[in-house]
């Protein structure tokens, strides 16, 4: 795992390397941050391009594509799952039993659930390692003036789903572009901003909503909660960058240099605490980078599942496999009059 360690270390050291991780996370947003980094590491070790669309051997076959002879699998971490039946016992407690087992007397069946019981390695292949039927993958050429309000509404819907109202105002706290008030469950966005800027600010504030509430125990553990405001800002801005990038909006180089400075500050504080009152092993820079990447990608995925950007998020099953490119107006191979293509035909070698 030296390669993975190196990727995370560089991400802490260099804003450009952090941006590369975020760009990959935007393309592969259906994957966890850890798996994105794993895929990037393995492709880099082979001297090939970054992964764009990955799937298992049989999944590629279902879409009319075959893995090229001699290609070696990429590996990601996948959950082991088990189906169980949840029952409510007479004393009010809940109990889970294997599906098919007899429930205790007096128990009320509450239905079946899928539980994660462990983790395993799963072999996948990038589209560049396959050949066969072209995959027609929608992509964004940037949001139009019509699409920006739709993005805004879907982002506001995420806020409402978490119990926050969204206000566009010229008089919010500190006259900042955006502000999240956890006490009032309210997100405020500057009324002087143009529609695209408002969407960007709202995406940033959603990063705070999803990651930095008063019960953010993971953030406190790794120094990225509101107790370490600079690193919390890096997380929120990274969420905004990833979400907007997935929608075809490039926010430019991120200020990931903050990550290095705040990671060092957290480590120094933990070293001091460890020498006085705590026996906890201080976090390393890579531990902090791993935590931030995982939190950012998890929050981004939750948002993107609602905003539904073009593309497949790096996973194949939702792709349309077809020998016919013609007639698909939103796919590559067809350029509507006076308009650029808004799709990508991936056909491999």
Which sequence ranges carry the predicted segments?
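N-terminal accessory/interface modules of nucleic-acid-binding and processing proteins
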Residues: 1-347
